[in-house]
């Protein structure tokens, strides 16, 4: 793994993984605290959050977080998301067309270890994740021996970038915590196929 760091005018980026298995970069303080708080408040109030249920083994269970999805072609896209897109493109200049949002209401909300469904992504296009609200840990774990494990604290205003290849080699998730934590919103920018063949299990 490369131990190099990168510096930008918006924040300090740590190269977490950079090898044949993919590239992941964590940019702390990609935007300032005031802006991050404003975006959080606007999205928390304005987004039409939904509670989903999913089949697990032989029964349906509640998804332990609230979800939403917006298209970048939506003329009513909140200004905060357009501004966040501009920020995301400072780090990955891709033609993002999809925004997935998750609201973790407290420490009981989580997302299990997973990789993004590669069939629902344009090959070789990056994913950019923006964190807003409370700090939560993300656990990144290698799919193959020795199952490398990386834990990152994602704070308000942080960005995490992942390239396409990492989805084949690593899972990522937000575990539950017993700590008293406030709500957190994650904003995920992706490049989806234009043929409409995606849509199940959006995160």
What are these regions (language model features)?
Residues 1-203:
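Non-heme Fe(II) oxygenase metal-center motifs and adjacent flexible, charged/small-residue loops
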